[in-house]
């Protein structure tokens, strides 16, 4: 039976980075994955260019029942550390918006970089490998694989969450946590589009593909100011994906379709300058024409000129466009979700090492635990930071 210092399960962002860093620190590491290729989710991310971190990473951008848990790891391995590594590999990158960093070329460059770092650390990578059983004794961990049995002093679970099952997502990590007595918090899809109830969806069907700047507020007061996209299933776009992580079934979200415009003042100015101009054409100066036409067809925008618009109508119009209350039917679920909310309870883990407090040698990193970042590179940075913290702990075990 082949023995390793550590076995890492999951060749995604966190798993590859942890294996590489532990290997380079002198540990003998086996990296396992059930897929044909490593880094499948990395390749799909950022429209194929991988939004690998964010310039503005801070703990406040992460959701967890323990909001303090992520602080240590994020402080010890920062976005600047990963940017430095990307630079050493000659990967050109650019900032797209809101601090989001993307490869100029392809997400494959990040995967290749991680594979190279694994090779540098002498990591043994085995793909298309199923972990059938995990057992623990005084000597560490024994894993029954499809075709062989291996053992190790330490076991690192980097198997991710439930989002994007088409890329191999599974509840494997949660099952291992429960097997060893760790609490797993309820999971749900995060960073995911909303679906709408049929009556509202039918009213908005002509808007599919229309994108508009917005400010969306959840019932807990959280606000995101980014674009909203109308789809044939409901609402999407960065603002919707962001707010979905703060939304609970049955709740409303409030949408401001004109976050950069004081609509009341704008209408008053236009009325003074162009009293005979139609209200529809005036609003089309600030909103997509298709959106204005749809709202007028629904009776939300009076078919009048500016001088005919009375104060009550103007007040109602401002309310409609800047305080639109929407109750989503649900979300599109794990199929299209970028992340999984919930997971292994961080109160069960050390924030410095990612090791289970009551199970020596068992570690959890990345998305499998209850730490979820905002859209825009934050979840990749958590993968790098939690993996680095774990790798340092593995190195100290020598």
Residue ranges of predicted features:
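N-terminal Rossmann-like FAD-binding beta1-loop-alpha1 element of flavoenzymes
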Residues: 4-31, 390-395
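Short hydrophobic core segments
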Residues: 7-9, 32, 131, 150-166, ...
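Glycine-rich loop(s) and the adjacent beta-strand/alpha-helix scaffold that form part
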Residues: 154-200
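Glycine-rich FAD pyrophosphate-binding loop
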Residues: 23-47
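Feature captures the FAD/FMN-dependent oxidoreductase FAD-binding
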Residues: 76-154
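An anion/pyrophosphate-binding glycine-rich loop and adjacent beta-alpha core
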Residues: 36-38, 43-44, 52-59, 92, ...
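Glycine-rich active-site loop/strand segments that organize a redox cofactor
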Residues: 49-95
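A glycine-rich dinucleotide-binding beta-alpha-beta segment and adjacent secondary-structure elements
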Residues: 127, 293-372
């Amino acid at each position: 039976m082949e023995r390793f210092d550590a076995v890492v399960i999951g060749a995604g962002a966190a798993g590859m980075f942890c294996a590489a860093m532990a290997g380079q620190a002198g540990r003998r590491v086996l990296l396992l994955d059930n897929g044909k290729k490593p880094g499948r989710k990395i390749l799909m991310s950022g429209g194929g260019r991988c939004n690998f971190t964010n310039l503005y990473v801070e703990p406040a951008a992460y959701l967890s029942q323990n909001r303090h848990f992520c602080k240590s790891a994020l402080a010890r391995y920062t976005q600047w550390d990963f940017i430095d590594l990307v630079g050493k590999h000659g990967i050109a990158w650019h900032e797209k918006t809101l601090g989001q960093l993307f490869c100029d070329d392809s997400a494959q460059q990040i995967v290749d970089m991680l594979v190279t770092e694994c090779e540098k650390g002498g990591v043994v990578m085995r793909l298309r490998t199923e972990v059938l059983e995990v057992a623990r004794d005084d000597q560490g961990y024994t894993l029954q694989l499809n075709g062989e049995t291996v053992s190790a002093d330490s076991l690192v679970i980097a198997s991710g969450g439930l989002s994007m099952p088409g890329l191999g997502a599974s509840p494997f990590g949660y099952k291992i946590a429960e097997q060893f007595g760790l609490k797993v918090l309820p999971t749900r899809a995060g960073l995911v589009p909303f679906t709408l109830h049929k009556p509202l969806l039918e009213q908005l069907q002509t808007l599919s593909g229309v994108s508009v700047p917005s400010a969306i507020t959840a019932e807990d007061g959280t606000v995101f100011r980014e674009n909203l996209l109308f789809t044939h299933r409901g609402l999407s776009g960065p603002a919707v994906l962001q707010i979905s992580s703060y939304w609970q079934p049955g709740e409303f979200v409030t949408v401001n379709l004109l976050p950069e415009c004081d609509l009341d003042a704008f209408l008053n100015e236009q009325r003074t300058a162009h009293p005979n101009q139609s209200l529809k054409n005036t609003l089309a100066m600030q909103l997509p024409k298709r959106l204005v036409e749809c709202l007028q067809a629904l009776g939300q925008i009076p078919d009048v000129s500016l001088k005919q618009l009375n104060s009550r109508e103007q007040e109602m119009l401002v309310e409609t466009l800047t305080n639109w209350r929407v109750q989503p039917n649900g979300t599109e679920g794990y199929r299209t979700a970028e992340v999984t909310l919930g997971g292994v309870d961080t109160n069960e883990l050390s924030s410095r090492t990612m090791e289970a407090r009551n199970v020596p040698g068992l570690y959890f990193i990345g998305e499998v635990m209850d730490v979820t970042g905002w859209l825009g590179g934050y979840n990749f940075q958590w993968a790098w930071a939690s993996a680095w913290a774990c790798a340092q702990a593995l190195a100290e075990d020598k």
